[in-house]
Amino acid sequence: MTLREYILFWQETYDKHQSRPTTYAAHNYVFKNHILPSLGDIPLSELTSEMVGDFLEGRRRFGNHRPGSSGLGEETMRHIHRLLQQCLDQAIRDGLLTENPAKAFRYRKSTTVKANIMTPLEMEDYLDAAERLGYLPMFMLALTTGLRQGELIALKWSDLDIENRTLTIAENRAVVRRELVEYGSQTRTIALTPEVIDLLIREHDKHPSSPLMFMHPATLKPYSPQMVRRMHDEIIKEAGIDHIRYVDLRHTCAILALKNGVDTKELAQMLGHYRPTITRQNYEPYLPHKVQKDEDIPNEATQSELICSLHERQ
């Protein structure tokens, strides 16, 4: 049995039934585009730690399998490594291997996220550009709440409580092939500012019959993550801040919250982190030992109120 044959077996037998649909799709992408082209034809019983190490080092240096191409980022490398280990661990339980050849490779783990924190001027330019392009409600919501892309595109109007100014995030809802899929009931609730509520009410008036908060105007289906990235790329190009990634909206929201006195437990709940220690590890290195209030930031402002105050609209 080759590694390719076992991976296909593992996907159908285990991964498809144990992972979320979006996670399963992401795993399939990694296997197809990274692991199988290099290691797929090797007999499973002949796979060695040296082969795995050479493969991972090659992906680190040449991400697209050929010299001259740019290497893979640290997060992608760790994801590939973990996935291969997970698959081979099951091969041991299935009695096909006695040890995991992927475990000998040690890839340095980063202790913090790599974040480009937006300045007040960059936030204002970003929101100005989003408004000119017609994308303001979606990206104002993203910047003021730190929502992940997948959470943003899966929102429904029934998640919004206008009276209490809150939004309930269905953490087990996802967009798969442009359709909403729900596979659990875990939720978290976050507060919204009056400015964001007003924007969302006006957005609802544009398509009141749709259950989706944000949808593609031509297909009336949810946006895909790729579409959100393209819209974000349009915004940063229009604003002239090309170094800002979508994930930096989330990082900016988190850092501003901490600077304004939100504790890590509360921030972890808002961001959907499993443990506050993850939040602390990710973001506290970006702050002074004793957090001082930025002179540009009103002391009484929450992270959402701060960002909204930068760009008041009628």
Please identify what each model-predicted range represents:
Residues 8-21, 32-114, 128-129, 203, ...:
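N-terminal core-binding DNA-recognition domain of tyrosine recombinases/integrases
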Residues 47, 79, 225, 242-260, ...:
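Short basic/aromatic active-site micro-motif
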Residues 70-74, 78-80, 93, 97-99, ...:
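Basic, Lys/Arg- and aromatic-enriched nucleic-acid-binding interface segment
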Residues 93, 140, 144-151, 227, ...:
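C-terminal catalytic core of tyrosine-transesterase DNA break-rejoin enzymes
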Residues 159-166, 262-282, 307-310:
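Short, polar N-cap/turn motifs at the start of nucleic acid-interacting alpha helices
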Residues 164, 175-198, 202, 218-219, ...:
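C-terminal secondary-structure termini that scaffold catalytic or DNA-interacting sites
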Residues 172, 193-241:
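Active-site/catalytic core of tyrosine-dependent DNA strand-transfer enzymes
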Residues 173, 271-296:
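Catalytic-site neighborhood detector that most strongly recognizes the C-terminal catalytic loop/helix
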